[in-house]
């Protein structure tokens, strides 16, 4: 069986579901194609849920533009879709003059990217904001707009809204091959899956860990995935709203090409 749509979105993680929800506003036929048997089973299910404010990306990059705007929009999305979003704020801690210079650079990045209310604060303000921060911290970049979500909850809310507005959802449908033919005026892409084929005019690659494979099959840009892993250690079980704290710099170990730091 083959179904035809204007747009096919490969991947039902938080990114694919959010894209589907936004595109459902338009008069388009859309299908989300997911390899797993449910949504958000890839990277979306196993990350910290931090909504970055946008002071890290280099000004002028696409990431800088979408990062700041996305953080701003999360408050609106939370109200519209009914998921929990907490603006806890965050601090990047510094311990010496070198760290302070790096924090100033992050502040300049953030200001250029449109991040609101960034400031460099001293020890008194650090411990007022987070009493359990290191007593050795001499300065910090304070960013009030950083927030937290549950990525699984956001993905569910976004896709439920999209499906309610006519978006089709195929699960247990890993893309095995992509045939490319014709122009954008026709059903240019044909996606082969175990549960049936999907034809579409436009293909959106939101496949997360499998994005490079989808890009290769579609004859698009070849790229290599660079994997990252963060480890979160729970050291305090007291129920309270926690603020994310970061060291100023990440250091490469002498033994291997590993980055050592706290996330």
Task: Please describe what each predicted stretch is.
Residues 25-44:
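Glycine-rich FAD pyrophosphate-binding loop
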Residues 30, 117-118, 203:
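Hydrophobic anchor at the start of a short beta-strand
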Residues 49-129, 138:
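Dinucleotide-binding Rossmann-like beta1-alpha1 core, especially the glycine-rich loop
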Residues 251-263:
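Single conserved hydrophobic/aromatic residue that forms the stacking wall/gate
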């Amino acid at each position: 069986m083959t179904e035809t749509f204007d747009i096919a979105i490969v991947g039902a993680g938080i990114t694919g579901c959010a894209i589907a929800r936004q595109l459902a506003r338009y008069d388009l036929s859309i299908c989300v194609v997911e390899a797993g048997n449910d949504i958000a089973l890839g990277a979306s299910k196993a990350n910290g849920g931090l909504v970055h404010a946008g002071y890290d990306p280099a000004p002028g990059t696409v990431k800088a533009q979408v990062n700041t705007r996305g953080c701003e929009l999360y408050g609106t999305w939370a109200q519209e879709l009914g998921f929990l979003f907490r603006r806890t704020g965050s601090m990047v801690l510094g311990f010496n003059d070198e760290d302070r210079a790096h924090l100033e650079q992050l502040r300049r990045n953030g200001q250029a990217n449109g991040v609101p209310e960034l400031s460099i604060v001293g020890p008194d303000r650090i411990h007022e904001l987070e009493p359990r921060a290191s007593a050795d911290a001499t300065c910090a970049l304070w960013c009030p707009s950083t927030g937290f979500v549950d990525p699984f909850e956001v993905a569910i809310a976004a896709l439920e809204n999209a499906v309610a507005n006519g978006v089709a959802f195929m699960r247990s449908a890993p893309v095995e091959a992509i045939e490319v033919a014709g122009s954008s005026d026709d059903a240019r892409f044909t996606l082969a899956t175990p549960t049936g084929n999907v034809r579409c005019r436009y293909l959106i690659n939101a496949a997360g860990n499998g994005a490079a494979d989808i890009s290769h099959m579609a004859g698009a840009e070849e790229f290599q995935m660079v994997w990252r892993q963060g480890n979160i250690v729970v050291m305090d079980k007291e129920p309270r709203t926690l603020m994310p704290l970061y060291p100023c710099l990440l250091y490469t170990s002498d033994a291997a090409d590993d980055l050592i730091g706290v996330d």
